Amino acid sequence: MTLITEVRLRKILDSRGNPTVEAEVRTENGGFGRGAAPSGASTGEYEAVERPAEEAIAQARELAVPRIEGQVYAGDQRGVDNALHGADGTDDFSEIGANSAVAISMAAAKAAADVLGAPLYQHLGGAFRGRDFPVPLGNVIGGGEHAADATHIQEFLAAPVGAPSVADAVFANAKVHGEVQRQLDERGVPAAKGDEGAWAPSIDDSEAFEIMEEAIAAVEDEVGFEIRFGLDVAGAELYEDGVYHYGDETRSPDEQVAYIADLVEEYNLVYVEDPLDEDDFSGFAELTERVGDRTLICGDDLFVTNTERLQRGIDDGAANSILIKPNQIGTLSDAFDAIELATRNGYDPVVSHRSGETEDTTIAHLAVATDAPFIKTGAVGGERTAKLNELIRIEANA
């Protein structure tokens, strides 16, 4: 019933105005699914390869589509994704592009869910998923690779951990975003928005921490539940020539570990992503030993949703959480493999958007399907609120 009869590929815009790949999948009995690939700005060295959209589409049409149309069932996600791997023939999707692969993979999953008449999260997670919903991490102050002349730390993330519902959490993050703007206005600091909709003021990191504390305290008073915050340090982007660069100041790897540990203690951080360089497994292990009982130390560039790198982290005790970005690894099956390995070894999966996004909502369903404790998908902006509003709908209809 779910035999795939047609795969269509086209070029569309992402949120940065760059071309990306969209796929549509149809089945023999009318099932339909559409998926669109996101794109990152601060990309890990070990990610699957994203090809220019037109090249990725041409290669996928030539190599992948003939292996799928009339050959594979949308309900067999592993079969779809194995066909994509077979068509590509490399270990990093450098032939057809991870952007084409992930778009087709997501579209096939949606087509299968459509045939079943079930929400995507039920198709992906089955009837036995837990009852908890992910807490959205809202990016409210941004810098690094997402905004020029702003903070060195790439993301300051609101985390409404005490919210009684997803909807309450989503609106709390939007309130924090608005309160940050008010705090900046009071200080006479102008700010545009970065790639992910966060404010990108020309302030130093210490002032950003002050503003986060004040904004969160104000919103906590209004909503009546606990809001903490976290960071995406994007350590690999700060690391060069053996040291971490914060403007004119530098820190050695040992000093960086101590600095992050101090931040966790001082600000009661609930989440710290990529605090160190993407190859510093030992530094991640040391930091996890120091503060891993109090916060999530999450590997993004460290692991790139890759089971081989995650297994190395598990063996070394590096981090206690993994960021899950399907386009980093190329298919939903590969993302699920990373999630399964993580949860089996006590690592929390955190599902994430990319800085260059579309209105695709797959990651909202993936986060719910896999009982992820957090989802990173911004606080405001149409391509971000598409996922947030989908989370609200999922919770309301569950």
Curated annotation (Swiss-Prot):
Catalysis: reaction(s): (2R)-2-phosphoglycerate = phosphoenolpyruvate + H2O
Example of a GO MF term: phosphopyruvate hydratase activity
Functional description taken from the UniProt entry: Catalyzes the reversible conversion of 2-phosphoglycerate (2-PG) into phosphoenolpyruvate (PEP). It is essential for the degradation of carbohydrates via glycolysis.
Domain of life: Archaea
GO process annotations (BP): glycolytic process
Enzyme class: lyase
Xref: InterPro entries: Enolase (IPR000941), Enolase-like_C_sf (IPR036849), Enolase-like_N (IPR029017), Enolase_C (IPR020810), Enolase_CS (IPR020809), Enolase_N (IPR020811)
Protein name: Enolase
Pfam families: Enolase_C, Enolase_N
